[in-house]
A protein has these predicted regions:
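A generic beta-sheet turn/junction motif
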Residues: 25, 36, 52, 77-79
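A short, N-terminal "cap"/entry segment at the start of jelly-roll beta-barrel domains
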Residues: 1-23
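Short, conserved beta-strand element in jelly-roll/cupin
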Residues: 34-50
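Structural motif
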Residues: 47-49, 56, 72, 81
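Short acidic-glycine-tyrosine-enriched beta hairpin
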Residues: 53-70
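Ligand-binding loop in jelly-roll beta-barrel domains
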Residues: 69-89
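Conserved short histidine dyad/triad with adjacent acidic residue
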Residues: 18-35, 69-70
Length: 89
C-alpha cells in the first residue's frame, strides 16, 4: 500500500503537478465527462468508482488509479463518501 508522502513523491518524479485533496459526500456523482489532462489519484479514505465506456473500476483506501487525457468517464463516490489525492499531468 502506498502512503500519501510516497504517492506525492512518485507523482512528482513522473511529471505530475502538485496533489490536491478532493472530498465527495456520500454517493456524490459526476456525470460522464473528459479532462484535457491525465490524472492519477490515491484514495485516502472511502471508495470511488470510475466508469469508462468499456469498464468500471472501484478503488478503496490505499488504491491508485490513473486515467489518460480525454477519456470519457463518470465518477461515483461510495456510500460513506471518499477522500482522495489527485494529480494532473
Amino acid at each position: 500500500m502506498v502512503d500519501e508522502a510516497n504517492f506525492r513523491e512518485k507523482m512528482k518524479k513522473d511529471g505530475y503537478g502538485d496533489a490536491t485533496v478532493r472530498d465527495f459526500l456520500p454517493n456524490h456523482s459526476l456525470p460522464t465527462h473528459t479532462h484535457e489532462f491525465g490524472a492519477s489519484l490515491l484514495v485516502l479514505d472511502g471508495e470511488i468508482t470510475i466508469t469508462m465506456e468499456d469498464r468500471s473500476v472501484t478503488c478503496q483506501t490505499g488504491d491508485i488509479f490513473a486515467l489518460d487525457a480525454n477519456v470519457p468517464h463518470a465518477e461515483q463516490g461510495g456510500e460513506e463518501g471518499v477522500r482522495f489525492l489527485v494529480c494532473r499531468k
